[in-house]
């Protein structure tokens, strides 16, 4: 892990290696937050690395891209979100995330949440947020990324 100057010297940044097969398809930046989206060659996984403050505007742009991605699909796909670098999220985000249910080809929504407290909070919103699987460890995240990296068109 390396130090992140934006958050001061006491906060360490997440430095997991994304498998080479992944292709960056979109970067959404706001003043305080960012979402970078990648897909595997077979387009069966859309992977999002979120960081900073996840505002309603940032989330709305992300969900618009996810919806466009879904419309371009003819096969089932998985949406995997890494929240390790999220510092704060707007309290209404769970209501917006409920829109994920409207994607016809989305078969699974997986979220990596390293914090036990945040996993508990997300479980409390279980009826609002359609999370199919919550990952606790970086190893679980890396395993899913590696499995999907091996898939070909």
Predicted regions and their residues:
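Amphipathic, Lys/Arg-enriched alpha-helical "gate/interface" segment within cytosolic domains
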Residues: 2-153
